Amino acid sequence: MKLSKRILACAITAAMATSMLSACNGSTTTSGSASNADTSQGNSSTTENSNSGNNSSTDGNGGSNGGNIVEAPSNGDTLKWLGYYDLNTDDKEIVDKFNDAGYKVETISTSSTEYFTKLAQLVASSDSPDMVRYEWQSYPHGVANNLYTSLDDYVDFDSDTWSGMKDMIENFNYGGKHYYLPYRVNPGVVLIYNQTALDDEGIKTDPLELYKEGKWTWTAWKDIMTEWCNIGDDYYGVMPTGFVAMPFIVSTGTTLIDVDGPNKQIINNMKDANVQRCQEFLSDIANQGMVNAEYTDPSTCLSATKTLFAEFGLDWGWTSAQAAAKDQDIRFVPIPRDDKADKYYTNTDTFGYLVPAGAKNIKAALKYMEICRLNEIDPELIAKSKAEMTAEHLYYPKCPECGVSTADKTIEKCPSCGAARRENKKHSAMSEDLYQIYSDLKDTTSDKFAFLFDDCFGFSTDLTNMLQQGDSEGKGCVLGGPFKFGESYTNLRDSYYGTVESFLEPYRALMQKN
């Protein structure tokens, strides 16, 4: 049996876990459907949206609370944005449309590490920004600490603009109110793998084909890893990352921690039978020597080690791995279905914005959010995004010869002067099969998946660190111990259930007050 190098693995995990969650939580600032921020921002086009005049849900003409929508407060044409990047440059196409609507963005800069501290200071000093981005700790942590403004009075969630996101918006219900307006669904955590390596080793089982045939289950996943690991002692089945067991627990139809906003409850499911069963399954895989507990970047994890699968957020993980191995067939599949689940449950993530408490220009913030959402559902922009994501080659908009920019990134030569355009070497083309999975993992209206969001990383940093890494001595790693090191989940559960409860109790008290 192979022994995991635990000390090194724990050190690397401690260094990487926070950045891993941050990278997944906001992989791209632009409201795009593309998987690579450097290549295609599908919904960031300057294409005019034909519905922008008809679907408005923030102009005071609708009603999600009995039709009593009121006009949002405004103090002019300037949107004060607090962030660790500048929307004017990083979300330029959206800002251009925002400018066309008569608004402008003023950036209040902060670092990602000081983000919540700065926000709290500004709110407390009555100098609130008008809009901030969503982070995993925005809900329930930020909402519980009164950092945001409820948007129920100003937005019609049943409008054409927002109805497609209504269920997702409801996921973030807090005491009957809605503070977070996600405008897009992001594909969650997937398993990336190297099909070329499988072919080279003569393994005939194809995870992608198993998924397409409806046979991609925990059992099928374990079987192919067993076959792979039997090749040699230095072969591993899977490399966990900062998400560790979370997406696998979700596949059972249960989340580790559930915030039931309408009923003002925070539920700790550590003792749930599904959580127990999943953790025991992952612990068994680790104890059979299938788990590579040493974190490696997605650009090298499949090519530099003999690891078959790696657990990453789709946007960053697959694009990085494929871009670094152009001569190999890097693919991805969803987290396998739990054999005993009644549906194919999958983890998901969203992106959008919130309005801080005390904001003076809520109207401008809602206009920005509306533009983002309209871009997200524009059929022309969706088609454009697909064309770019599946294109063999992509090119930078600005011609290196004449300087003219061309919106179509798939054209090899500049339409104005005929010169060759500069190719984007970071681009990796998705096959039609992979693009279909990518689309399915964003489509909450489809019956292919049942989407669940685990609230476990939305509380304090200390709780997140404990779930991922354990305490200061590395003990109590609830999500990582069984999966990475084969630890007994029963022992972890019995020893640390009370500790997790102590982290949750203050949030329960705050929820009852709000």
Per-segment meaning from a language model:
Residues 223-225, 260-295:
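Glycine-centered hinge/linker elements that transmit conformational signals in sensory
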Residues 4, 9-11, 22-140, 376-388, ...:
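Conserved N-terminal structural module of periplasmic/extracytoplasmic solute-binding proteins
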Residues 132, 174-185, 189-191, 214-266:
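Extracytoplasmic/periplasmic solute-binding protein
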Residues 152-164, 210-214, 254-277, 337-344:
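Short, solvent-exposed loop/beta-turn-alpha elements that line the ligand-binding surface or hinge
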Residues 63-70, 134-188, 219, 333:
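Hinge/lid segment of periplasmic solute-binding proteins
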Residues 323-395:
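Extracytoplasmic/periplasmic substrate-recognition and gating elements
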Residues 404-406, 421:
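Cys/His-rich microdomains that often coordinate metals
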Residues 399-402, 414-417:
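Short cysteine-rich clusters marking metal-coordination/redox-active sites
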